[in-house]
Amino acid sequence: DLPFSVKLPNALDPHLRIRDYGVGMTEDVVYDVYINYMKSDKTDTNSETGCFGIGSKTPLAYADQFNITTYNDGTMTMYALVKSEDGVPELNEFGSWDTQEDNGVEISFSVKEDDFNKFSNRAVEVYKYFNTRPEVSGNGDFAYPERKDIISGDTWRISKGSYSDNTVVVMGNVAYPVDVWQFEYDSKERGFLHNNAVIEVPIGDLNVAPSREALEYNEHTLKGISKAIDRVMAEIADSIGVRFAKANSWWQAKAIQREIVREIKGIGSIEELSMFNGRSLDDYPELY
């Protein structure tokens, strides 16, 4: 996928600019999407993030207006969506010009100087979970944190952390911390969720609040989280079996067992997975 670009606000240009390189938006689509609340072009699909019909207007939560620039087959058109005195959005079209830019859309708005660092820090937190990260400019200090994975699969990973760390699920590139208190104290879910883990799930497997800031913890979401954890735990069990198979002695197998217990939380009975030469490690002397 061709990454979209993000220009962070700075002293030379205080605008946040987000530019994609998709199919662009025709005039009819612009008016349809930006004037109608609860209007979405993603209502009937789980292949893209969206469907509530309010995401396109979210810049108005910060600014009184924002700019929309569309690029369609050699034509650039500029619009501004303005919040009127009564709170109703008004779309103003400035005009169209010839361009050699690739098709796509750019959204931009002015950011207060005191908020420059907040936008940069938030960009790190949001984009670090993206499968295809954007090309970020405007801040020479922008960098993603180094990640030290303990164990991982194609759609999940567990990194070094503390007991206070909790699991995050990622759906449609959006990360949602999972509330451990939604599960019973002695449940397998709650035990696992204390890992510093990231699990990707398909769009539609969980329900989210309209704000997209949190999960909606109904029966569908709880079952979806439980299903995702079961999948990860099964893969971890397979991986642990491979690690024990590499042990050259029961002493080394015991050391592997302790390392696993220290690194990974809530994976069930580690004793059931701890084997050496086909025998449970419980049959061997304790390692001191």
Predicted regions and their residues:
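Conserved structured core elements
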Residues: 12, 24-31, 52-53, 57, ...
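A generic structural motif
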Residues: 21-22, 109-115, 207, 214
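Intrinsically disordered, low-complexity terminal/linker regions enriched in Pro/Ser/Gly
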Residues: 246-257
